[in-house]
């Protein structure tokens, strides 16, 4: 197995036999399935009428942006003469990492919002929106 030196944390060792875009397409399909499942789970709970749909759309757009922005990664190809050829693809890895952190924070906020909304509405009937309980 070949060693790659001086590889930063933002670099990913990619499989040279698998094009990066097919992996990206697979991740997009899986993520779309997860978002549709979340929507179906919370569809009847009254959360969807509020901010959950906007939150899910915002998270979906941010993560799609992550998938379409290529990371900085290195591919290693074994040449016929036995040597290993390294090809480094660079991109805005810092921007991608910042968006990754932002998407993670939004996901945590969405989960906290759902839990708090569930606890706040626990035991109450389905009340109209805009009515303030004093």
UniProtKB/Swiss-Prot annotation:
Keywords per UniProt: Host membrane, Membrane, Transmembrane, Transmembrane helix
Major subcellular site: host cell
The keyword Transmembrane helix is annotated on this UniProt entry: yes
Transmembrane segments: 21-41, 52-72, 95-115
One GO location term (cellular component): membrane
Disulphides: none
Cellular compartment(s): Host membrane
Membrane-protein topology: Multi-pass membrane protein
Protein name: Uncharacterized protein ORF134
């Amino acid at each position: 197995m070949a060693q790659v030196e001086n590889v930063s944390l933002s670099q990913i060792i990619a499989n040279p036999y698998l094009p990066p875009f097919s992996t990206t397409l697979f991740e997009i399909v899986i993520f779309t399935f997860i978002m549709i499942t979340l929507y179906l789970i919370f569809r009847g709970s009254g959360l969807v009428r509020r901010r959950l749909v906007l939150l899910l759309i915002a998270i979906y757009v941010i993560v799609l942006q992550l998938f379409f922005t290529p990371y900085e990664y290195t591919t290693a190809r074994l040449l016929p003469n036995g040597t290993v050829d390294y090809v480094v693809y660079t991109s805005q890895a810092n921007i991608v990492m910042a968006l990754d952190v932002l998407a993670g924070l939004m996901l945590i906020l969405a989960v906290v919002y759902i839990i708090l909304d569930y606890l706040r509405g626990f035991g109450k009937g389905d009340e109209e929106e805009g009515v303030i309980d004093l």
